[in-house]
Amino acid sequence: MAADDLRFFSDNTGTACPEILSAIAQANRGLAIAYGDDEWTGRLDATLSEFFATEVRAFAVATGTAANALSLATLSPPYGAIFAHEESHIAVDECGAPGFFSGGAQLMLLPGEHGRLSSATLTAALSAHRIDVHTLQPAALSLTQATELGTVYRPADINQLAAAAHARGLKVHVDGARFANALAFLACPPADITWRAGVDVLSFGATKNGALAAEAVVFFDHALVRDFELRRKRAGHLLSKSRYVAAQLLAYIETGVWRRNAERTNRLAQSIGRAAGAALMHPVEANEVFVRLGIERRQALRDAGFGFYDWGAESAGEARFVASWDHPEEDVRALCAALARL
């Protein structure tokens, strides 16, 4: 098989699922009012309010970086400090976007086992942070759910972290690019890992889980909404034909495809993790698998036609494998067999 047929690079390499494409086609009939005043965008608040079991305000954007950076810019002034894990997407893969859109806010990066922050680490960092006119002012905590290392925060974890943040006056943001995978793993109501646990705003991802290009910024704290609306427009992320993004998000939720795709990718990742055995680096709780193979064994996998990203220190021969919603079962079985043979 060609390398493209055995790709485990990223869930971003996957296709858009039929339910999403059908929704776009349905929205592509006739005229609709522009800039979010269409009927599809008009339904987002109600649909997501039902999903989260509380009244929310939701805004469609096309990329996860826009969702994260504009959310954090809403939470932090230019002189603000945003506390996040050192492996977080906003720290490693967004080209300084939070600082750019906020006008200067800086990330304060913290360690944490398996990609997760602990309330003890956050509390210690906040306690050590000097507060006076000469320093950045603590403004926000950003968590990633599921994390960049394929692990998941439990509801109690988020509750403790949010409580520590709120006690110091910080708002709480969650990067939920793989939020569906976290929900599928926890099998809990969406509310339990968002507003009930103290989250103020969520970047609700769909693109990695079968959408074409669709993310929603979901506000549980409605006082933040007006500022965000203006920031989104000023940043060029208020789409004139918003109906096509909103239609994806509605289909993603209303058809239940979010759950179906996430459960499948989680299951495939679990299979890969079991095959990796002792080489596994982190618990497999979402759709990402990290293994430490050594340089020679990693190259042997690549020579066998498997596509994946190198990860971590080059000398350790680490690799990341990501399951997509449309991965053929036989490709996953082939990877599992190859890992077991190493």
Language model feature labels by segment:
Residues 2-304, 310-326, 330-331, 335-342:
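Conserved PLP-enzyme active-site core in the AAT-like
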